[in-house]
């Protein structure tokens, strides 16, 4: 079998010039006046930063009326159906404050104090409600119930379960 050598002929190709011209495509032209003013939204009043001082540490929907016992049990039941561990927390102050340090850290008042231990193995919303009533009798400050996912190790749900009279 004889070896054959093929000679390739080199052809001159034009260098790459980019994509096709878009001159034939319709283009929406913006007026130059719309780009003349660049704004970060400084004139918008509905997007202001929440004041950091003098605010209660209530959660997202805390402006709503207090939950009834039935609504509270439904929330806890939802928490349990998702296999989250219920925990009770309370806050004596209700305000963000710094007592021992001027730098932000764990003990600067942004975190609530946990009531007893998380309720691992809890399967009934009435157990959580009974524990909430015991917590209210012992410390009549603000109470929150949270749902903790011990697999992902994250908090998935928090809501205000009890606000003492006179708190806003």
UniProtKB/Swiss-Prot annotation:
GO cellular component: chloroplast
Main location: plastid
Gene Ontology biological-process entries: photorespiration; reductive pentose-phosphate cycle
Coiled coil: none
Key words of the record: Calvin cycle, Carbon dioxide fixation, Chloroplast, Photorespiration, Photosynthesis, Plastid, Transit peptide
InterPro entries referenced in this protein's UniProt entry, alphabetically: RuBisCO_ssu, RuBisCO_ssu_dom, RuBisCO_ssu_N, RuBisCO_ssu_sf
Pfam families: RbcS (PF12338), RuBisCO_small (PF00101)
Chain segment of the transit peptide: 1-45
Signal peptide: none
Keyword Ion transport assigned: no
CDD domains given in the database record: RuBisCO_small
Compartment(s): Plastid, Chloroplast
UniProt-listed SUPFAM superfamilies: RuBisCO, small subunit (SSF55239)
Keyword Metal-binding attached: no
Purpose: RuBisCO catalyzes two reactions: the carboxylation of D-ribulose 1,5-bisphosphate, the primary event in carbon dioxide fixation, as well as the oxidative fragmentation of the pentose substrate. Both reactions occur simultaneously and in competition at the same active site. Although the small subunit is not catalytic it is essential for maximal activity.
Subunit structure: Heterohexadecamer of 8 large and 8 small subunits.
Note: The basic functional RuBisCO is composed of a large chain homodimer in a 'head-to-tail' conformation. In form I RuBisCO this homodimer is arranged in a barrel-like tetramer with the small subunits forming a tetrameric 'cap' on each end of the 'barrel'.
Family from the record: Belongs to the RuBisCO small chain family.
Name of the protein in its database record: Ribulose bisphosphate carboxylase small subunit, chloroplastic
Organism: Saccharum hybrid (Sugarcane)
Organism lineage string: Eukaryota, Viridiplantae, Streptophyta, Embryophyta, Tracheophyta
Gene expressing this chain: RBCS
